[in-house]
Amino acid sequence: PQWRGNYGVRFWHSDWQAIIFEYTDKILATGFDGVYLDKVDEFEEMGHKDEMVEFVARIAARAKSQRADFMIVSQNGDALIPNARFRKAIDAFAREDLLYGENAEGARNSAASIRESVRRLKMLTAEGKPVFVVEYPRNEEQAKTARREISDNKFIGLIAKRALDQL
């Protein structure tokens, strides 16, 4: 869904990145163990794929220069996974709608799309990085299928309502 107050930004602009780096410093100073970077797939709407890799890598470098064990978890944008610099920058990856909902709420994604995403995600598990998959099934049958396929691929799954208002 379109979340109220959620909108794309020109993440490749230095002024915007300065804001994020300032927040990263505050997060570190507060003592959090890491950050969960949502909307990493924004490059799919705006272009600038290489700039997104660079941005995530810069966030990671800044954070890890202050605390080596600080976690960087990226959500979505699995087209970035083949990039070695991106893989090096992140500690874990989360993917929404791997099996259902890519094109229409509750609709099964194409076999080709699933196969390609799984191939990319397994590049991370081969490096020992956890992969989380969040599915928003419409019914119990979809939930059951999603649990099985997520488990079969050795991913960590969450079945939830899209509103994320309950676990």
PLM region spans:
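Glycan-processing catalytic domains of CAZymes
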Residues: P1-L167
